[in-house]
Each structure stands twice: as C-alpha cells, then as structure tokens.
C-alpha cells in the first residue's frame, strides 16, 4: 500500500509505503521514489513506477498499470462536479442516469481538476521474483506540481 501526498514543490506531508504479508506481518518499505506515467496532453496517468526498499534495504520495484480510469468528479459528485455536487439534495425519489463521452474534450477536460480512481494492476519485483496484484490506483495532481513538470493548473504532460 502506498499513500503519498505532496505539496507543489514535492515536499511530502504524507508518506506511507507498506507491504502486508499473508500471515499479517506489516513491513515498511522506506521512502518510495515515484514516477507517474501520463497520457500525453493530459494529467491522466497510464501507470507508475515505484522504487522502494524492503526492511533489509534491498530494492523493490512496483510497476503499476491503469486498466480503467474513472474521474470521480465527472458524474460521481466529488469535487467540482457540475452535474451532481457532493451532498446536494435533489428530492426523495430523485433518480437520474447520465452518460459521458470520455472522448469529448469538454468532458475529459474536467479530469485535470479532480482525483481519478483507476482499476490498477501492479507487479512487485522483489529480487528475482514477481507478484501480481490488483486494486485501487488513485491519483490527483491539482495545480502546480514540480516533480511532474506541471507549472500551473493548466499544464499537461508532453
């Protein structure tokens, strides 16, 4: 499990990288180095490479792949979702279904302004062994983020 929160200059206010073994042991994996891979022209990750160390100092690498990005503030009510603002009461029997064309520039353009949850596939490379896992890969780079090369709210990946 990796949870990282960084300020615009990359300073980490939250840094947790742990491995949980089948027998319940929890191992801290040091200070992970993260490289997010973005789809060109967007802030939507296609995956990440995470380098960490086990408790003995030996290197570990995680290759994370996005299998399905879901901008949770496009129709999900999070953040500044213009269609369903989080917590807005629309009536006792209100029901609605909306369909979004994620290729529409007006829709996908909203992705840069909120968190994106991904169906994530990760492979942990530990020495000569590899192990595959699946889970949530959640990402958001809002505004300036120097480590990603984003100088302001509108900068996107090359």
List the model feature ranges, each with a label.
Residues 1-158:
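Structured soluble/peripheral alpha/beta segments that form catalytic or ligand/cofactor-binding pockets
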């Amino acid at each position: 499990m990796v949870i990282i929160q960084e300020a615009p200059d990359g300073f980490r206010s939250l840094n947790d990288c742990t491995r949980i073994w089948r027998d319940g042991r929890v191992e801290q994996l040091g200070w992970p180095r993260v490289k997010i891979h973005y789809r060109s022209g967007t802030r939507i990750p296609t995956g990440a490479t995470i380098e960490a160390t086990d408790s003995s100092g030996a290197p570990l690498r995680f290759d994370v792949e996005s299998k399905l990005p879901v901008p949770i503030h496009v129709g999900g009510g999070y953040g500044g979702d213009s269609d369903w603002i989080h917590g807005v009461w629309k009536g006792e029997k209100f029901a609605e279904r909306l369909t979004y064309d994620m290729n529409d520039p007006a829709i996908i353009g909203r992705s840069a302004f909120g968190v994106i949850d991904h169906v994530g596939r990760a492979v942990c490379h530990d020495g000569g062994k590899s192990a595959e896992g699946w889970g949530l890969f959640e990402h958001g780079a809002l505004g300036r983020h120097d480590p990603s090369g984003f100088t302001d709210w509108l900068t996107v990946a090359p």
